[in-house]
Amino acid sequence: MYPAHLLVLLAVCVSLLGASAISNQPRNLVQFSELIQCVNKGKRATYHYMDYGCYCGKGGSGTPVDALDRCCKTHDDCYGQAEKKGCFPFLTLYNFGCFPGGPTCGKGNTCQRFVCDCDLKAALCFAKSPYNNNNYNIDTKKRCK
């Protein structure tokens, strides 16, 4: 085998290894995380919102435990409205800008604007709501009824 062929084969193998390491997490969640960081200026890591209360994170049920959890329920409801409009909020990528005065949603189609608005409203709500460490990683079976 020629050295050039070996280099091409090596490049293909490295590319495939890199592609297999890419998460299948919906890319919209990355944008939502960036919006949160833009609004709170990095004061709280996004992962703190991933397992908070009854609604922040995957799923949601019961009565929200506090104002921050209500932000998450409102965000879930907003995504539900997006789905009713035929959008796929977890997969919809949108344009936004992070400016000194705060983030703004950019131009796009109806679904992109709607989903960006859901995420922006939630990020702003997170920023103004107190964070209670006692509501992080709670026992949802007991507290979310």
From Swiss-Prot:
Task: Identify the keywords attached in UniProt to this record, alphabetized.
Answer: Calcium, Disulfide bond, Hydrolase, Lipid degradation, Lipid metabolism, Metal-binding, Neurotoxin, Presynaptic neurotoxin, Secreted, Signal, Toxin
One BP annotation, GO: phospholipid metabolic process
Q: Which residues form the active site?
A: H75, D119
The places in or outside the cell where this protein is found are: Secreted
The residues the entry assigns to the signal sequence are 1-21
A GO CC annotation recorded here is: extracellular region
- Top enzyme class, one word, equals hydrolase
- Major location, coarse class? secreted
**Family to which this protein belongs:** Belongs to the phospholipase A2 family. Group I subfamily. D49 sub-subfamily.
Q: What is this protein called?
A: Basic phospholipase A2 PC17
Instruction: State the species of origin.
Output: Laticauda colubrina (Yellow-lipped sea krait)
